Amino acid sequence: MAGGNFELVALGNPLLDMQIRNGEAMLEKYGLKPNDAVLADEKQLAIYQDLVDNYDVTYVAGGAAQNAARCAQYVLPANSTAYLGCVGKDDLAKQLQAANDKEGLKSIYQFSDDQPTGSCAVVITGHNRSLCTNLGAAEKFNKSHLDTAEAQKAIKNAQTFYLGGFFLTHGVESALVLAEEAKTRDVSLTMNLSAPFIPQFFTAQVDQVVPYADVIFGNETEAAAWAEAHKLESKDLKTIAQAIADFDAVTAKAQARVVVITQGSQPTIVAKRGETQQYVHETPKINPADIVDTNGAGDAFAGGVLGALVLGKTVDEAIEVGHKLGGMCIGQVGPILKFPKENVL
């Protein structure tokens, strides 16, 4: 595969992460769980200024699908990835663009006139991370942006699309445009469940997109939320992964759907549509002393898997690459990888 054609195009919510450590008091104050992701309610909107006033904040480029796309680019030739999302006309957007430029991800942003770039409070406690998001401009993404010349060029070249589950809270119409494009051209549509509240409260939107998807990522809590939303009685992760794999399929590629469920340091589970046996991939052991924080580890894993699949690797080989990038990410502050690049293929 030659680089330069934007083989992978991701769609999601571009956010600037505002990360703090030792945030136990913040969890209690704002009613957050240690290892969760939520959209900020009215009471929680005060958290962003609170962090700035009372903590040493580290600012890092975030947004789950944007993180995954940057991590996919890490293993791909130059100019292989592009990202679609909506930002404000502000300094936060410039910071996101600069991070993407540095790591070789092409930003095809829509700009909102009246909303600031979205932000995400990342509260680190021990090896856990709690995410509290104010979408801002991100939820102003308009389907018309997909028709712009720059977006069309990337979309028509894409061999793989990646949808962040978070995007489905407001952008299912845009997601379905890419899903239909994937179906028409028989290319890959991949997606991430992203957080328990997505399959739990946006079940209808998830169920609209899943039939087009041939690779679906999630973690153990997201899989459990999907099972509950679909009245699946089993709590067994292999059974749940298989149920997601066997869900409706409307494209040729989705007929061979692969579902990948991570569970932190525990083995990664893989289910393939129509099969009776699931596969278990051991996660490389990491010394707890080497863990800086886990923010973005799941995105790094997904990005590694996607990048490897775009390169034509098998699912097993791709998961190995994903584990390497996830392991690398938790040794850094925030959702970033080591530079100069290390060969993980």
Regions found by a protein language model. Name each.
Residues 1-82, 94-95, 291:
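Glycine-rich phosphate/adenosyl-contacting loop at the front of the ribokinase-like
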Residues 1-21, 34-35, 180-184, 228-345:
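Conserved phosphate-binding/catalytic region of the ribokinase-like
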Residues 151-156, 209-210, 253:
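A short, aliphatic-rich alpha-helical micro-motif
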Residues 103, 108-112, 120-168:
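Conserved phosphate-binding/catalytic loop of the ribokinase/pfkB sugar-kinase fold
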Residues 11-13, 85-89, 112, 124-126, ...:
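Cofactor-binding loop segments of dinucleotide-utilizing enzymes, especially the Rossmann-like FAD-
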Residues 85-89, 106-117, 241-246, 259-263:
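Beta-strand->loop->alpha-helix junctions that form or flank phosphate-binding loops
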Residues 160-242, 266-268:
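Conserved beta-alpha-beta core of the PfkB/ribokinase-like small-molecule kinase fold
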